[in-house]
């Protein structure tokens, strides 16, 4: 009997034993860095001369791994392997597939410190964030395994005299997973193995910045005994193989987490029926946000400031759920702003190997983009805190607060994906909700209020997929906070929800006459 689902815990780094353990994990991982990693197609490891170099964003002289780069022919071979593996994998019972996934999660649990340590180096994640990422990966796998067991027998439908009816679920086929670099293990593992436990096969194209951690999942899948070809590992240049993966006639579904521009491109291209394709593709896309914390009058300003600062600057603001807009009632605006500035000054920034609160941003492109937005912010509003940048060794951006903004300013409209939060002053709660909704995105939001009527208004009118009361707008927990957004934030395919696997299943009805 499978035990009841419970979330995987992190490590308490106030306990010296845990600190020492994780320092050892970091040292052990560092010894393994710089190696070449292969493609994995039909279980075969294929090393290529052309490679993607993964570097430590906190120390760009440190090479994390050299990932073999897949060509279109490699992708074609991977599709053939996945299609062939699907013939057998789809015949496994739901329980057998789920039990294999539970074995995968057990292996990850034993290697949790190693997995987290890799993300400290490869993604520049702070210790707590890296451990949380690894733990969330376990949660996704465990949750989806149990979800598949729940769906195994289908759902009851009505019978009538002389007729027995069955309603059940079947897998779709081969699909493509394109995960992000900001949650390089949790989202990557969840969006890869959800369709797999549902009986499908997958081509996994990892983020260019974080291929090493994705390859570790491939090692774990092999150790767990996943049949060859069920998951095929094809890192590569998106300009070379991205469209090919999406357009392919055998791609039944695409799971994507990333930018709005790429997500809408995938959605558009997936709508085209290719020659030899006799089905319609499904797209599961999460495309970011412009998330706001609304602060009402007559509230605890300390709590409001803490919610804003932790939501804005955790993992250097590189979360699709990060707070990039603080919408504050005029009566508490100055106090909340002042307290937010004070808290921000206390944050530590540096190489996350040293357990700093904030680390680097992921790469030079993002660094330059964020730096440019800070300059825009200086023109549109007032720079209150931070604004400094340094790419002499890594890609470091100070936590930045810009005040005096208007709703239509670029800082308040465009996704920055870095440690920058803009403050706007509003006259009342109605205006606050109006400003909160004045964006193309609708992922997360939070409301700090003691007014129940205002909270009810926010529940009904604040147009986001995940809304929180009197807390920050980040840190959704699998099983508690199914995650996904509205509008241009994506398809609202709630990850970590009882419905998520339905995106990778077809419903079949069988009616038998007696």
Curated annotation (Swiss-Prot):
One of its GO terms (molecular function) is 1-pyrroline-5-carboxylate dehydrogenase activity. It catalyses: L-glutamate 5-semialdehyde + NAD(+) + H2O = L-glutamate + NADH + 2 H(+). The active site is at residues 286, 320. GO terms for biological process: glutamate biosynthetic process; proline catabolic process to glutamate. Pfam families: Aldedh. Its EC number is 1.2.1.88. The keyword Ligase does not apply. InterPro entries: Ald_DH/histidinol_DH, Ald_DH_C, Ald_DH_CS_CYS, Ald_DH_CS_GLU, Ald_DH_N, Aldehyde_DH_dom, Proline_metab_enzyme, RocA. Keywords: NAD, Oxidoreductase. Belongs to the aldehyde dehydrogenase family. RocA subfamily. PANTHER family: DELTA-1-PYRROLINE-5-CARBOXYLATE DEHYDROGENASE 1, ISOFORM A-RELATED, DELTA-1-PYRROLINE-5-CARBOXYLATE DEHYDROGENASE 2, ISOFORM A-RELATED. This is 1-pyrroline-5-carboxylate dehydrogenase. It comes from Staphylococcus aureus (strain MW2). The lineage of its organism: Bacteria, Bacillati, Bacillota, Bacilli, Bacillales. The gene is rocA.
């Amino acid at each position: 009997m499978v035990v009841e689902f419970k979330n995987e815990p992190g490590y308490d780094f106030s306990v010296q034993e845990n600190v020492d353990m994780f320092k050892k994990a970091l040292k052990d991982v560092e010894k393994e860095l710089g190696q070449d990693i292969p493609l994995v197609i039909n279980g075969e490891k294929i090393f290529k001369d052309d490679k993607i170099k993964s570097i430590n964003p906190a120390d760009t002289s440190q090479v994390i791994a050299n990932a073999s780069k897949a060509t279109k022919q490699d992708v074609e071979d991977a599709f053939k392997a996945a299609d062939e593996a699907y013939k057998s994998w789809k015949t496994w019972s739901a329980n057998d597939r789920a039990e294999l996934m539970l074995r995968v999660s057990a292996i990850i649990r034993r290697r949790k410190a190693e997995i987290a340590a890799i993300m400290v180096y490869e993604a520049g994640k702070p210790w707590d964030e890296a451990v949380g990422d690894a733990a969330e990966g376990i949660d996704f796998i465990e949750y989806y395994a149990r979800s598949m067991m729940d769906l195994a027998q289908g759902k009851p439908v009505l019978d009538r005299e002389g007729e027995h009816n069955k309603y059940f679920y079947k897998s779709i086929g081969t699909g493509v997973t394109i995960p992000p670099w900001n949650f390089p293990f949790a989202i990557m593992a969840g969006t890869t193995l959800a369709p797999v436990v549902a009986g499908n096969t997958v081509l996994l194209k990892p983020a260019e910045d974080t291929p090493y951690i994705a390859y570790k999942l491939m090692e774990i899948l092999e150790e767990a005994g996943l049949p060859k070809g069920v998951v095929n590992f094809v890192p590569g240049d998106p300009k070379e193989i991205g469209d090919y993966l999406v357009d392919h006639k055998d791609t039944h579904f695409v799971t994507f987490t990333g930018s709005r521009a790429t997500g809408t491109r995938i959605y558009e291209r997936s709508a085209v029926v290719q020659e030899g394709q006799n089905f319609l593709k499904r797209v599961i896309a999460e495309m970011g946000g412009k998330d706001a914390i609304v602060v009402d009058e007559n509230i605890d300003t300390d709590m409001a400031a803490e919610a804003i600062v932790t939501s804005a600057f955790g993992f250097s603001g590189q979360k699709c759920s990060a707070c990039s807009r603080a919408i504050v009632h005029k009566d508490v605006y100055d106090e909340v702003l002042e307290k937010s500035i004070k808290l921000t000054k206390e944050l530590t920034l540096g190489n996350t190997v040293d357990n700093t609160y904030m680390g680097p941003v992921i790469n030079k492109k993002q660094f330059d983009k964020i730096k440019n937005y800070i300059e825009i912010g200086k023109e549109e509003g007032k720079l209150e805190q931070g604004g400094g940048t340094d790419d002499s060794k890594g890609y470091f951006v100070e936590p930045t607060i810009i005040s005096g903004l208007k709703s239509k300013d670029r800082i308040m409209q465009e996704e920055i994906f870095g440690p920058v939060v803009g403050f706007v002053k509003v006259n009342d709660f109605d205006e606050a909700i109006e400003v909160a909704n004045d964006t193309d995105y609708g992922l997360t939001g939070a409301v700090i209020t003691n007014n129940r009527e205002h909270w009810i208004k926010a529940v009904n009118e604040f147009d986001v997929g995940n809304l929180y009361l009197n807390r920050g707008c980040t840190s959704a927990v699998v099983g508690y906070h199914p995650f996904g957004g509205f509008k241009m934030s994506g398809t609202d395919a709630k990850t970590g929800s009882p419905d998520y696997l339905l995106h990778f299943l077809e419903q079949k009805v069988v009616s038998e006459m007696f």
